[in-house]
Protein backbone atom coordinates (compact mmCIF):
# COMPACT_ATOMS: atom_id res chain seq x y z
CA UNK A 1 0.00 0.00 0.00
CA UNK A 2 1.07 3.57 -0.53
CA UNK A 3 2.47 5.16 2.56
CA UNK A 4 0.75 8.44 1.83
CA UNK A 5 -2.42 9.05 3.76
CA UNK A 6 -5.48 8.42 1.61
CA UNK A 7 -9.16 7.86 2.15
CA UNK A 8 -9.70 4.58 3.95
CA UNK A 9 -13.38 3.83 4.48
CA UNK A 10 -13.89 1.50 7.41
CA UNK A 11 -16.79 0.44 9.59
CA UNK A 12 -16.63 0.81 13.35
CA UNK A 13 -16.00 -2.47 15.10
CA UNK A 14 -19.29 -2.35 16.97
CA UNK A 15 -21.21 -1.94 13.71
CA UNK A 16 -19.55 -4.78 11.82
CA UNK A 17 -19.85 -8.41 12.66
CA UNK A 18 -16.90 -10.66 13.32
CA UNK A 19 -16.46 -14.14 12.00
CA UNK A 20 -17.83 -15.54 15.27
CA UNK A 21 -21.10 -13.67 14.50
CA UNK A 22 -21.28 -15.59 11.24
CA UNK A 23 -20.97 -18.92 13.01
CA UNK A 24 -17.32 -19.65 12.24
CA UNK A 25 -14.31 -19.93 14.54
CA UNK A 26 -11.41 -17.53 14.32
CA UNK A 27 -8.49 -19.46 12.80
CA UNK A 28 -4.85 -18.67 12.30
CA UNK A 29 -4.08 -18.29 8.60
CA UNK A 30 -0.73 -19.02 7.07
CA UNK A 31 -1.17 -16.19 4.62
CA UNK A 32 -0.15 -13.09 6.54
CA UNK A 33 -1.15 -10.87 3.65
CA UNK A 34 -4.83 -11.75 3.93
CA UNK A 35 -6.84 -8.54 4.52
CA UNK A 36 -9.47 -8.01 7.16
CA UNK A 37 -12.68 -8.44 5.19
CA UNK A 38 -14.64 -6.49 7.77
CA UNK A 39 -13.23 -3.26 6.38
CA UNK A 40 -14.19 -2.03 2.93
CA UNK A 41 -11.02 -0.59 1.43
CA UNK A 42 -11.66 1.35 -1.75
CA UNK A 43 -9.74 4.45 -0.97
CA UNK A 44 -6.06 3.97 -0.14
CA UNK A 45 -5.21 6.23 -3.05
CA UNK A 46 -5.65 9.92 -3.66
CA UNK A 47 -8.83 10.49 -5.61
CA UNK A 48 -7.46 13.63 -7.23
CA UNK A 49 -5.12 13.01 -10.12
CA UNK A 50 -4.03 15.61 -12.70
CA UNK A 51 -5.87 15.27 -15.99
CA UNK A 52 -8.70 13.15 -14.62
CA UNK A 53 -10.88 16.00 -13.47
CA UNK A 54 -11.58 14.65 -10.00
CA UNK A 55 -11.49 16.98 -7.05
CA UNK A 56 -12.82 20.30 -5.97
CA UNK A 57 -14.46 21.11 -2.68
CA UNK A 58 -15.47 18.28 -0.41
CA UNK A 59 -18.94 19.59 0.28
CA UNK A 60 -21.64 19.27 -2.33
CA UNK A 61 -23.40 22.50 -3.23
CA UNK A 62 -27.12 22.57 -2.71
CA UNK A 63 -27.84 24.57 -5.79
CA UNK A 64 -31.22 25.82 -4.71
CA UNK A 65 -29.40 27.86 -2.08
CA UNK A 66 -26.87 29.54 -4.33
CA UNK A 67 -27.25 32.99 -5.74
CA UNK A 68 -25.71 34.79 -8.63
CA UNK A 69 -26.62 36.55 -11.77
CA UNK A 70 -27.72 35.09 -15.05
CA UNK A 71 -25.16 33.51 -17.32
CA UNK A 72 -24.86 31.95 -20.72
CA UNK A 73 -25.32 28.35 -21.71
CA UNK A 74 -21.67 28.12 -22.71
CA UNK A 75 -20.06 31.18 -21.17
CA UNK A 76 -17.68 30.94 -18.23
CA UNK A 77 -19.66 30.67 -15.03
CA UNK A 78 -22.88 31.45 -16.83
CA UNK A 79 -26.30 30.08 -16.15
CA UNK A 80 -28.43 28.99 -19.08
CA UNK A 81 -32.15 28.86 -19.33
CA UNK A 82 -33.03 32.01 -17.45
CA UNK A 83 -30.92 31.76 -14.31
CA UNK A 84 -28.13 30.11 -12.44
CA UNK A 85 -25.16 30.96 -10.34
CA UNK A 86 -22.47 33.08 -11.88
CA UNK A 87 -19.54 30.94 -10.80
CA UNK A 88 -21.05 27.86 -9.24
CA UNK A 89 -23.82 25.41 -10.05
CA UNK A 90 -26.87 27.07 -11.55
CA UNK A 91 -30.48 26.20 -12.10
CA UNK A 92 -33.64 27.51 -13.70
CA UNK A 93 -34.81 29.88 -11.01
CA UNK A 94 -38.43 29.59 -12.06
CA UNK A 95 -38.13 25.86 -11.34
CA UNK A 96 -37.59 24.85 -7.71
CA UNK A 97 -35.31 21.98 -8.68
CA UNK A 98 -32.76 21.37 -5.97
CA UNK A 99 -29.67 19.20 -6.43
CA UNK A 100 -26.19 18.54 -5.13
CA UNK A 101 -22.92 18.17 -7.02
CA UNK A 102 -20.84 15.39 -5.48
CA UNK A 103 -17.19 14.46 -5.88
CA UNK A 104 -15.96 10.91 -6.43
CA UNK A 105 -14.95 10.56 -2.80
CA UNK A 106 -18.42 11.63 -1.68
CA UNK A 107 -19.93 8.92 -3.88
CA UNK A 108 -17.65 6.40 -2.19
CA UNK A 109 -18.93 7.65 1.15
CA UNK A 110 -22.53 7.21 -0.04
CA UNK A 111 -21.67 3.64 -1.06
CA UNK A 112 -20.14 2.89 2.32
CA UNK A 113 -23.17 4.33 4.09
CA UNK A 114 -25.44 2.13 1.97
CA UNK A 115 -23.34 -0.92 2.88
CA UNK A 116 -23.39 0.08 6.53
CA UNK A 117 -27.20 0.28 6.55
CA UNK A 118 -27.49 -3.19 5.05
CA UNK A 119 -24.88 -4.64 7.39
CA UNK A 120 -26.79 -3.45 10.43
CA UNK A 121 -29.28 -6.15 9.44
CA UNK A 122 -27.45 -8.96 7.65
CA UNK A 123 -24.12 -8.77 9.57
CA UNK A 124 -21.62 -9.72 6.83
CA UNK A 125 -18.12 -8.50 5.95
CA UNK A 126 -18.33 -5.20 4.08
CA UNK A 127 -16.63 -6.56 0.97
CA UNK A 128 -19.19 -9.38 0.71
CA UNK A 129 -22.10 -6.98 1.23
CA UNK A 130 -20.80 -4.72 -1.54
CA UNK A 131 -20.80 -7.64 -3.99
CA UNK A 132 -24.31 -8.67 -2.90
CA UNK A 133 -25.60 -5.12 -3.38
CA UNK A 134 -23.97 -4.89 -6.81
CA UNK A 135 -25.71 -8.11 -7.83
CA UNK A 136 -29.07 -6.53 -6.95
CA UNK A 137 -28.19 -3.21 -8.61
CA UNK A 138 -27.83 -1.57 -5.20
CA UNK A 139 -31.48 -2.22 -4.37
CA UNK A 140 -31.39 -2.76 -0.61
CA UNK A 141 -34.98 -3.97 -0.38
CA UNK A 142 -34.51 -6.69 -2.99
CA UNK A 143 -31.34 -7.89 -1.28
CA UNK A 144 -33.04 -8.02 2.13
CA UNK A 145 -35.98 -9.95 0.70
CA UNK A 146 -33.74 -12.56 -0.92
CA UNK A 147 -31.41 -12.77 2.06
CA UNK A 148 -34.16 -13.79 4.46
CA UNK A 149 -36.12 -16.09 2.15
CA UNK A 150 -34.39 -19.12 3.72
CA UNK A 151 -32.04 -20.10 0.89
CA UNK A 152 -28.72 -18.39 1.62
CA UNK A 153 -26.62 -20.95 -0.25
CA UNK A 154 -28.46 -20.26 -3.48
CA UNK A 155 -28.12 -16.50 -2.96
CA UNK A 156 -24.36 -16.64 -2.41
CA UNK A 157 -23.96 -18.98 -5.39
CA UNK A 158 -25.86 -16.54 -7.63
CA UNK A 159 -23.68 -13.68 -6.41
CA UNK A 160 -20.49 -15.75 -6.92
CA UNK A 161 -19.16 -15.37 -3.38
CA UNK A 162 -18.37 -17.83 -0.60
CA UNK A 163 -20.79 -17.85 2.33
CA UNK A 164 -18.88 -16.05 5.13
CA UNK A 165 -20.06 -18.68 7.64
CA UNK A 166 -17.94 -21.26 5.76
CA UNK A 167 -14.92 -19.00 5.48
CA UNK A 168 -12.76 -20.58 8.22
CA UNK A 169 -13.58 -24.10 7.09
CA UNK A 170 -12.52 -23.27 3.54
CA UNK A 171 -9.29 -21.68 4.72
CA UNK A 172 -8.45 -24.71 6.84
CA UNK A 173 -9.05 -27.11 3.96
CA UNK A 174 -6.76 -25.13 1.68
CA UNK A 175 -3.90 -24.44 4.10
CA UNK A 176 -0.59 -25.34 2.48
CA UNK A 177 2.71 -26.15 4.08
CA UNK A 178 5.32 -23.42 3.82
CA UNK A 179 8.22 -25.87 4.15
CA UNK A 180 9.01 -25.87 0.44
CA UNK A 181 8.66 -23.73 -2.66
CA UNK A 182 5.64 -24.31 -4.86
CA UNK A 183 4.94 -23.56 -8.54
CA UNK A 184 2.42 -20.86 -9.46
CA UNK A 185 -0.29 -22.36 -11.66
CA UNK A 186 -0.17 -19.35 -14.02
CA UNK A 187 3.54 -18.62 -14.58
CA UNK A 188 4.84 -22.02 -13.31
CA UNK A 189 7.68 -20.36 -11.38
CA UNK A 190 8.52 -21.62 -7.90
CA UNK A 191 7.92 -19.32 -4.94
CA UNK A 192 7.68 -19.78 -1.18
CA UNK A 193 4.18 -20.21 0.19
CA UNK A 194 4.25 -16.71 1.69
CA UNK A 195 4.36 -15.26 -1.85
CA UNK A 196 1.03 -16.87 -2.75
CA UNK A 197 -2.39 -15.41 -2.12
CA UNK A 198 -5.93 -16.24 -3.13
CA UNK A 199 -9.63 -16.01 -2.45
CA UNK A 200 -11.92 -18.07 -0.24
CA UNK A 201 -12.33 -20.58 -3.08
CA UNK A 202 -8.83 -21.84 -2.19
CA UNK A 203 -7.09 -21.12 -5.52
CA UNK A 204 -3.78 -19.39 -4.87
CA UNK A 205 -1.36 -17.75 -7.28
CA UNK A 206 1.79 -15.68 -6.96
CA UNK A 207 1.33 -12.00 -6.23
CA UNK A 208 2.97 -10.92 -9.49
CA UNK A 209 0.49 -12.92 -11.58
CA UNK A 210 -2.38 -11.60 -9.46
CA UNK A 211 -1.27 -8.01 -10.01
CA UNK A 212 -0.91 -8.43 -13.78
CA UNK A 213 -4.23 -10.27 -14.02
CA UNK A 214 -6.12 -7.57 -12.11
CA UNK A 215 -4.42 -4.75 -14.02
CA UNK A 216 -5.40 -6.31 -17.35
CA UNK A 217 -9.00 -6.82 -16.26
CA UNK A 218 -9.32 -3.25 -15.02
CA UNK A 219 -7.35 -1.22 -17.56
CA UNK A 220 -7.88 -3.20 -20.77
CA UNK A 221 -11.24 -4.88 -20.26
CA UNK A 222 -12.85 -2.22 -18.08
CA UNK A 223 -14.03 -4.75 -15.52
CA UNK A 224 -14.56 -3.78 -11.90
CA UNK A 225 -17.29 -5.54 -9.99
CA UNK A 226 -17.22 -8.74 -12.07
CA UNK A 227 -13.56 -9.82 -11.87
CA UNK A 228 -13.51 -13.51 -11.03
CA UNK A 229 -10.82 -15.83 -9.71
CA UNK A 230 -8.23 -16.56 -12.46
CA UNK A 231 -8.51 -20.32 -11.90
CA UNK A 232 -10.14 -22.14 -14.81
CA UNK A 233 -13.86 -22.66 -14.24
CA UNK A 234 -13.94 -20.71 -10.95
CA UNK A 235 -16.52 -17.91 -10.85
CA UNK A 236 -15.86 -16.58 -7.33
CA UNK A 237 -15.55 -12.78 -7.51
CA UNK A 238 -12.50 -10.88 -6.33
CA UNK A 239 -13.36 -8.60 -3.40
CA UNK A 240 -12.35 -4.94 -3.16
CA UNK A 241 -9.78 -5.44 -0.40
CA UNK A 242 -7.93 -8.04 -2.46
CA UNK A 243 -7.83 -5.74 -5.48
CA UNK A 244 -6.58 -2.73 -3.52
CA UNK A 245 -4.00 -4.88 -1.70
CA UNK A 246 -2.49 -6.54 -4.77
CA UNK A 247 -2.40 -3.54 -7.12
CA UNK A 248 0.40 -1.02 -6.57
CA UNK A 249 -0.20 1.37 -9.49
CA UNK A 250 -2.29 4.34 -8.28
CA UNK A 251 -3.76 4.86 -11.77
CA UNK A 252 -5.12 1.31 -11.80
CA UNK A 253 -6.56 1.81 -8.32
CA UNK A 254 -8.20 5.05 -9.42
CA UNK A 255 -9.69 3.32 -12.46
CA UNK A 256 -11.01 0.51 -10.26
CA UNK A 257 -12.61 3.02 -7.90
CA UNK A 258 -14.28 4.72 -10.85
CA UNK A 259 -15.63 1.41 -12.18
CA UNK A 260 -17.11 0.51 -8.80
CA UNK A 261 -18.61 3.94 -8.21
CA UNK A 262 -19.93 3.97 -11.78
CA UNK A 263 -22.03 0.88 -11.09
CA UNK A 264 -23.40 2.57 -7.97
CA UNK A 265 -24.29 5.75 -9.89
CA UNK A 266 -25.76 3.98 -12.91
CA UNK A 267 -28.10 1.95 -10.70
CA UNK A 268 -29.38 5.00 -8.81
CA UNK A 269 -32.01 7.04 -10.64
CA UNK A 270 -31.26 10.05 -8.42
CA UNK A 271 -27.61 10.20 -9.52
CA UNK A 272 -26.11 11.17 -12.86
CA UNK A 273 -22.50 11.56 -13.99
CA UNK A 274 -21.54 14.91 -15.46
CA UNK A 275 -21.15 14.29 -19.23
CA UNK A 276 -18.21 16.71 -19.58
CA UNK A 277 -14.96 15.02 -20.68
CA UNK A 278 -12.63 14.15 -17.79
CA UNK A 279 -15.14 15.29 -15.17
CA UNK A 280 -15.85 12.76 -12.40
CA UNK A 281 -18.50 14.74 -10.56
CA UNK A 282 -22.00 13.40 -9.96
CA UNK A 283 -25.26 15.32 -9.69
CA UNK A 284 -27.69 14.12 -7.04
CA UNK A 285 -31.32 15.25 -7.26
CA UNK A 286 -34.33 14.89 -4.98
CA UNK A 287 -36.45 13.46 -7.79
CA UNK A 288 -35.57 12.61 -11.42
CA UNK A 289 -36.93 14.93 -14.09
CA UNK A 290 -36.00 16.60 -17.38
CA UNK A 291 -34.59 19.71 -15.72
CA UNK A 292 -31.33 21.63 -16.15
CA UNK A 293 -28.50 21.01 -13.69
CA UNK A 294 -25.01 22.51 -13.63
CA UNK A 295 -21.86 20.71 -12.54
CA UNK A 296 -18.99 22.37 -10.67
CA UNK A 297 -16.98 22.18 -13.90
CA UNK A 298 -19.50 24.56 -15.52
CA UNK A 299 -21.27 22.02 -17.76
CA UNK A 300 -25.05 22.45 -17.83
CA UNK A 301 -27.06 19.43 -18.93
CA UNK A 302 -30.47 17.81 -18.79
CA UNK A 303 -30.65 15.44 -15.84
CA UNK A 304 -33.07 13.13 -17.65
CA UNK A 305 -31.10 12.43 -20.84
CA UNK A 306 -27.62 13.77 -20.06
CA UNK A 307 -27.48 15.99 -23.16
CA UNK A 308 -26.81 19.73 -23.05
CA UNK A 309 -29.86 21.56 -21.74
CA UNK A 310 -32.23 21.61 -24.71
CA UNK A 311 -35.29 23.69 -23.88
CA UNK A 312 -37.80 23.83 -25.61
CA UNK A 313 -37.54 20.37 -27.23
CA UNK A 314 -38.28 17.28 -25.15
CA UNK A 315 -35.73 14.52 -24.57
CA UNK A 316 -37.64 12.03 -26.75
CA UNK A 317 -37.46 14.19 -29.85
CA UNK A 318 -33.89 15.31 -29.25
CA UNK A 319 -32.81 11.68 -29.01
CA UNK A 320 -34.50 10.91 -32.34
CA UNK A 321 -32.93 14.01 -33.89
CA UNK A 322 -29.41 13.15 -32.74
CA UNK A 323 -29.78 9.64 -34.13
CA UNK A 324 -31.09 11.02 -37.41
CA UNK A 325 -28.21 13.48 -37.67
CA UNK A 326 -25.69 10.75 -36.94
CA UNK A 327 -27.24 8.60 -39.66
CA UNK A 328 -27.98 11.25 -42.27
CA UNK A 329 -26.02 14.47 -41.98
CA UNK A 330 -22.72 13.41 -43.56
CA UNK A 331 -24.19 11.58 -46.54
CA UNK A 332 -27.51 13.29 -47.25
CA UNK A 333 -26.14 15.83 -49.74
CA UNK A 334 -24.27 13.16 -51.69
CA UNK A 335 -27.29 10.85 -51.69
CA UNK A 336 -29.55 13.61 -53.01
CA UNK A 337 -27.20 14.37 -55.89
CA UNK A 338 -26.08 10.90 -56.93
CA UNK A 339 -28.70 8.27 -56.11
CA UNK A 340 -32.32 7.27 -56.62
CA UNK A 341 -34.57 4.77 -54.91
CA UNK A 342 -35.67 1.49 -56.44
CA UNK A 343 -39.37 2.02 -57.30
CA UNK A 344 -40.21 -1.42 -55.89
CA UNK A 345 -38.23 -1.90 -52.66
CA UNK A 346 -37.00 1.70 -52.17
CA UNK A 347 -33.39 0.68 -51.67
CA UNK A 348 -31.04 3.56 -52.55
CA UNK A 349 -29.23 2.89 -55.85
CA UNK A 350 -26.22 4.59 -57.42
CA UNK A 351 -25.86 4.66 -61.19
CA UNK A 352 -22.37 3.46 -62.10
CA UNK A 353 -22.67 3.39 -65.90
CA UNK A 354 -24.22 5.23 -68.83
CA UNK A 355 -27.04 2.77 -69.53
CA UNK A 356 -30.48 3.69 -68.19
CA UNK A 357 -31.41 0.02 -67.75
CA UNK A 358 -31.17 -0.51 -63.97
CA UNK A 359 -31.31 -3.82 -62.10
CA UNK A 360 -31.84 -3.64 -58.33
CA UNK A 361 -29.11 -5.54 -56.48
CA UNK A 362 -31.41 -6.34 -53.56
CA UNK A 363 -31.62 -10.16 -53.59
CA UNK A 364 -35.28 -10.01 -52.58
CA UNK A 365 -36.21 -7.54 -55.29
CA UNK A 366 -34.19 -7.74 -58.57
CA UNK A 367 -36.54 -5.17 -60.14
CA UNK A 368 -35.62 -3.86 -63.61
CA UNK A 369 -36.50 -0.21 -64.25
CA UNK A 370 -35.57 2.90 -66.18
CA UNK A 371 -33.21 5.35 -64.45
CA UNK A 372 -34.87 8.35 -66.13
CA UNK A 373 -38.57 7.72 -65.48
CA UNK A 374 -38.28 4.99 -62.80
CA UNK A 375 -40.89 2.94 -64.66
CA UNK A 376 -40.61 -0.82 -65.44
CA UNK A 377 -37.96 -1.54 -68.02
CA UNK A 378 -39.82 -4.13 -70.08
CA UNK A 379 -42.08 -1.66 -71.97
CA UNK A 380 -39.05 0.38 -73.01
CA UNK A 381 -38.10 -2.14 -75.70
CA UNK A 382 -34.82 -1.21 -77.34
CA UNK A 383 -34.80 2.42 -76.21
CA UNK A 384 -31.59 1.92 -74.29
CA UNK A 385 -30.55 5.54 -74.06
CA UNK A 386 -33.76 7.48 -74.61
CA UNK A 387 -36.82 7.19 -72.41
CA UNK A 388 -40.14 7.97 -74.10
CA UNK A 389 -42.39 6.59 -71.37
CA UNK A 390 -42.92 9.73 -69.27
CA UNK A 391 -46.72 9.58 -69.27
CA UNK A 392 -47.28 6.04 -68.12
CA UNK A 393 -49.16 5.72 -64.83
CA UNK A 394 -46.71 3.38 -63.14
CA UNK A 395 -43.77 5.59 -64.08
CA UNK A 396 -45.62 8.62 -62.74
CA UNK A 397 -46.32 6.83 -59.45
CA UNK A 398 -42.66 5.91 -59.15
CA UNK A 399 -41.61 9.49 -59.81
CA UNK A 400 -44.13 10.76 -57.26
CA UNK A 401 -42.68 8.44 -54.63
CA UNK A 402 -39.21 9.65 -55.53
CA UNK A 403 -40.34 13.26 -55.23
CA UNK A 404 -41.81 12.63 -51.80
CA UNK A 405 -38.52 11.14 -50.71
CA UNK A 406 -36.61 14.12 -52.10
CA UNK A 407 -39.01 16.53 -50.40
CA UNK A 408 -38.52 14.78 -47.06
CA UNK A 409 -34.77 15.01 -47.51
CA UNK A 410 -34.94 18.68 -48.42
CA UNK A 411 -37.09 19.36 -45.37
CA UNK A 412 -34.57 17.60 -43.15
CA UNK A 413 -31.69 19.56 -44.68
CA UNK A 414 -33.57 22.83 -44.13
CA UNK A 415 -33.85 22.25 -40.38
CA UNK A 416 -30.49 20.53 -40.05
CA UNK A 417 -28.61 23.39 -41.72
CA UNK A 418 -30.20 25.96 -39.42
CA UNK A 419 -29.60 23.79 -36.38
CA UNK A 420 -25.93 23.39 -37.31
CA UNK A 421 -25.61 27.09 -38.16
CA UNK A 422 -26.72 28.15 -34.68
CA UNK A 423 -24.46 25.51 -33.14
CA UNK A 424 -21.49 26.90 -35.06
CA UNK A 425 -22.45 30.48 -34.22
CA UNK A 426 -22.70 29.50 -30.56
CA UNK A 427 -19.11 28.26 -30.68
CA UNK A 428 -17.98 31.51 -32.28
CA UNK A 429 -19.97 33.58 -29.79
CA UNK A 430 -18.25 31.69 -26.98
CA UNK A 431 -14.99 33.28 -28.16
CA UNK A 432 -16.59 36.69 -27.76
CA UNK A 433 -15.91 36.56 -24.03
CA UNK A 434 -12.21 37.21 -24.62
CA UNK A 435 -12.97 40.03 -27.06
CA UNK A 436 -15.55 41.55 -24.73
CA UNK A 437 -13.10 41.49 -21.84
CA UNK A 438 -10.66 43.52 -23.92
CA UNK A 439 -13.40 45.98 -24.92
CA UNK A 440 -14.45 46.35 -21.28
CA UNK A 441 -10.87 47.25 -20.36
CA UNK A 442 -10.72 49.82 -23.17
CA UNK A 443 -14.02 51.38 -22.08
CA UNK A 444 -12.76 51.72 -18.51
CA UNK A 445 -9.90 53.76 -19.91
CA UNK A 446 -12.51 56.16 -21.30
CA UNK A 447 -13.80 57.15 -17.86
CA UNK A 448 -16.36 54.35 -17.48
CA UNK A 449 -16.49 52.39 -14.23
CA UNK A 450 -16.25 48.60 -13.95
CA UNK A 451 -19.96 48.39 -13.14
CA UNK A 452 -20.88 50.52 -16.17
CA UNK A 453 -19.15 48.18 -18.62
CA UNK A 454 -20.76 44.98 -17.31
CA UNK A 455 -23.53 45.37 -19.89
CA UNK A 456 -21.20 43.86 -22.50
CA UNK A 457 -20.71 40.60 -20.59
CA UNK A 458 -24.44 40.45 -19.88
CA UNK A 459 -25.11 40.90 -23.60
CA UNK A 460 -22.84 37.96 -24.51
CA UNK A 461 -24.54 35.84 -21.84
CA UNK A 462 -27.94 36.60 -23.35
CA UNK A 463 -26.64 36.06 -26.88
CA UNK A 464 -25.38 32.56 -26.01
CA UNK A 465 -28.66 31.71 -24.28
CA UNK A 466 -30.62 32.79 -27.35
CA UNK A 467 -28.35 30.85 -29.72
CA UNK A 468 -28.79 27.68 -27.68
CA UNK A 469 -32.57 28.13 -27.53
CA UNK A 470 -32.82 28.83 -31.26
CA UNK A 471 -30.69 25.78 -32.04
CA UNK A 472 -33.16 23.50 -30.27
CA UNK A 473 -36.24 25.28 -31.65
CA UNK A 474 -35.33 23.84 -35.06
CA UNK A 475 -35.36 20.34 -33.62
CA UNK A 476 -38.77 21.08 -32.10
CA UNK A 477 -40.02 22.53 -35.40
CA UNK A 478 -38.79 19.56 -37.45
CA UNK A 479 -41.15 17.18 -35.63
CA UNK A 480 -44.01 19.69 -35.30
CA UNK A 481 -47.16 19.38 -37.39
CA UNK A 482 -48.56 22.54 -38.92
CA UNK A 483 -51.44 24.20 -37.10
CA UNK A 484 -52.34 27.66 -35.83
CA UNK A 485 -50.14 27.28 -32.77
CA UNK A 486 -47.15 26.22 -34.87
CA UNK A 487 -47.52 29.41 -36.92
CA UNK A 488 -47.36 31.48 -33.72
CA UNK A 489 -44.29 29.49 -32.68
CA UNK A 490 -42.56 30.12 -36.01
CA UNK A 491 -43.31 33.85 -35.74
CA UNK A 492 -41.80 33.93 -32.25
CA UNK A 493 -38.82 31.96 -33.54
CA UNK A 494 -38.27 34.34 -36.46
CA UNK A 495 -38.54 37.40 -34.21
CA UNK A 496 -36.02 36.03 -31.71
CA UNK A 497 -33.69 34.93 -34.50
CA UNK A 498 -33.70 38.38 -36.10
CA UNK A 499 -33.08 40.15 -32.78
CA UNK A 500 -30.28 37.71 -31.95
CA UNK A 501 -28.48 38.42 -35.23
CA UNK A 502 -28.74 42.18 -34.63
CA UNK A 503 -27.33 41.81 -31.11
CA UNK A 504 -24.49 39.67 -32.46
CA UNK A 505 -23.69 42.39 -34.97
CA UNK A 506 -23.57 45.06 -32.26
CA UNK A 507 -21.14 43.05 -30.17
CA UNK A 508 -18.76 42.47 -33.07
CA UNK A 509 -18.44 46.18 -33.88
CA UNK A 510 -15.41 48.21 -32.96
CA UNK A 511 -16.25 50.72 -30.24
CA UNK A 512 -14.84 54.22 -30.51
CA UNK A 513 -15.03 57.10 -28.05
CA UNK A 514 -17.65 58.86 -30.17
CA UNK A 515 -19.94 55.81 -30.45
CA UNK A 516 -19.55 54.64 -26.86
CA UNK A 517 -22.81 55.86 -25.39
CA UNK A 518 -24.76 55.10 -28.56
CA UNK A 519 -23.60 51.48 -28.79
CA UNK A 520 -24.17 50.99 -25.05
CA UNK A 521 -27.78 52.07 -25.42
CA UNK A 522 -28.33 49.89 -28.48
CA UNK A 523 -26.75 46.81 -26.89
CA UNK A 524 -28.75 47.19 -23.68
CA UNK A 525 -32.02 47.71 -25.53
CA UNK A 526 -31.40 44.77 -27.84
CA UNK A 527 -30.31 42.22 -25.23
CA UNK A 528 -33.30 43.12 -23.08
CA UNK A 529 -35.54 42.64 -26.10
CA UNK A 530 -33.87 39.27 -26.82
CA UNK A 531 -34.41 38.20 -23.22
CA UNK A 532 -38.07 39.15 -23.46
CA UNK A 533 -38.67 37.40 -26.81
CA UNK A 534 -36.85 34.25 -25.64
CA UNK A 535 -39.03 34.16 -22.56
CA UNK A 536 -42.17 34.59 -24.67
CA UNK A 537 -41.14 31.78 -27.03
CA UNK A 538 -40.41 29.34 -24.20
CA UNK A 539 -43.57 30.23 -22.32
CA UNK A 540 -45.64 29.60 -25.45
CA UNK A 541 -44.04 26.18 -26.02
CA UNK A 542 -44.49 25.19 -22.37
CA UNK A 543 -48.11 26.33 -22.48
CA UNK A 544 -48.56 24.10 -25.51
CA UNK A 545 -47.17 21.16 -23.55
CA UNK A 546 -49.52 21.81 -20.64
CA UNK A 547 -52.60 22.22 -22.84
CA UNK A 548 -51.63 19.49 -25.32
CA UNK A 549 -51.61 21.89 -28.27
CA UNK A 550 -48.74 20.32 -30.17
CA UNK A 551 -49.04 17.54 -32.72
CA UNK A 552 -45.96 15.72 -33.95
CA UNK A 553 -44.69 14.10 -37.12
CA UNK A 554 -43.44 10.60 -36.38
CA UNK A 555 -40.15 10.25 -38.24
Curated annotation (Swiss-Prot):
Pfam families registered for this protein in UniProt: Ariadne, IBR, IBR_1, UBA_ARI1, zf-C3HC4
Activity control: Autoinhibited by the ariadne domain, which masks the second RING-type zinc finger that contains the active site and inhibits the E3 activity. Inhibition is relieved upon binding to neddylated cullin-RING ubiquitin ligase complexes, which activate the E3 ligase activity of ARIH1.
InterPro entries in the record: Ariadne (IPR045840), ARIH1-like_UBL (IPR048962), E3_UB_ligase_RBR (IPR031127), IBR_dom (IPR002867), TRIAD_supradom (IPR044066), Znf_C3HC4_RING-type (IPR018957), Znf_RING (IPR001841), Znf_RING/FYVE/PHD (IPR013083)
Zinc finger (RING-type) in chain: 184-234, 342-373
S-S bonds: none
Residues annotated as binding Zn(2+) 4: 302, 305, 310, 315
PROSITE patterns, sorted: TRIAD, ZF_RING_2
Residues that coordinate or bind Zn(2+) 3: 274, 279, 295, 297
Ranges for region UBA-like: 103-151
Region (TRIAD supradomain): 180-391
Biased composition, class Gly residues, residue ranges: 65-90
Biased amino acid composition, Acidic residues: 1-47
Binding site for Zn(2+) 1: 184, 187, 206, 209
Binding, Zn(2+) 6: 370, 373, 380, 387
Any one Gene Ontology BP term: ubiquitin-dependent protein catabolic process
Reactions catalysed: [E2 ubiquitin-conjugating enzyme]-S-ubiquitinyl-L-cysteine + [acceptor protein]-L-lysine = [E2 ubiquitin-conjugating enzyme]-L-cysteine + [acceptor protein]-N(6)-ubiquitinyl-L-lysine
Biological or metabolic pathway of the protein: Protein modification; protein ubiquitination
Binding site for Zn(2+) 2: 201, 203, 229, 234
Alphabetical UniProt keywords: Acetylation, Cytoplasm, Metal-binding, Nucleus, Repeat, Transferase, Ubl conjugation pathway, Zinc, Zinc-finger
Renumbered zinc finger spans (IBR-type): 254-315
EC number of this enzyme: 2.3.2.31
Chain sites annotated for binding Zn(2+) 5: 342, 345, 360, 365
Locations listed in the record: Cytoplasm; Nucleus; Nucleus, Cajal body
Function comment: E3 ubiquitin-protein ligase, which catalyzes ubiquitination of target proteins together with ubiquitin-conjugating enzyme E2 UBE2L3. Acts as an atypical E3 ubiquitin-protein ligase by working together with cullin-RING ubiquitin ligase (CRL) complexes and initiating ubiquitination of CRL substrates: associates with CRL complexes and specifically mediates addition of the first ubiquitin on CRLs targets. The initial ubiquitin is then elongated by CDC34/UBE2R1 and UBE2R2. E3 ubiquitin-protein ligase activity is activated upon binding to neddylated cullin-RING ubiquitin ligase complexes.
Domain notes: Members of the RBR family are atypical E3 ligases. They interact with the E2 conjugating enzyme UBE2L3 and function like HECT-type E3 enzymes: they bind E2s via the first RING-type zinc finger, but require an obligate trans-thiolation step during the ubiquitin transfer, requiring a conserved active site Cys residue in the second RING-type zinc finger. The active site probably forms a thioester intermediate with ubiquitin taken from the active-site cysteine of the E2 before ultimately transferring it to a Lys residue on the substrate.
Protein name: E3 ubiquitin-protein ligase ARIH1
Gene from which this protein is expressed: Arih1
Amino acid sequence: MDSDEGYNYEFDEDEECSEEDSGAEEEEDDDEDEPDDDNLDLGEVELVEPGLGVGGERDGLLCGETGGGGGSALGPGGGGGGGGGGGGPGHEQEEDYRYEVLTAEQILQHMVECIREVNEVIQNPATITRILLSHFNWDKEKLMERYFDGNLEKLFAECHVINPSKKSRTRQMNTRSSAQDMPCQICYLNYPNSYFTGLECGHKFCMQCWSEYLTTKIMEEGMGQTISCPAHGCDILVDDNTVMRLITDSKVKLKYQHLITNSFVECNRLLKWCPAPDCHHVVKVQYPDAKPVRCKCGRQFCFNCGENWHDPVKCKWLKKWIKKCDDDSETSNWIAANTKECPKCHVTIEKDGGCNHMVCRNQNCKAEFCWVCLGPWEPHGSAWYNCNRYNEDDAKAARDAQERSRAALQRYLFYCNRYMNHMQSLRFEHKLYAQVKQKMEEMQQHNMSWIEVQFLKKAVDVLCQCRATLMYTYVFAFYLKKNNQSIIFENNQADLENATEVLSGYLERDISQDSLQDIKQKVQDKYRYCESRRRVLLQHVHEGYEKDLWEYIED
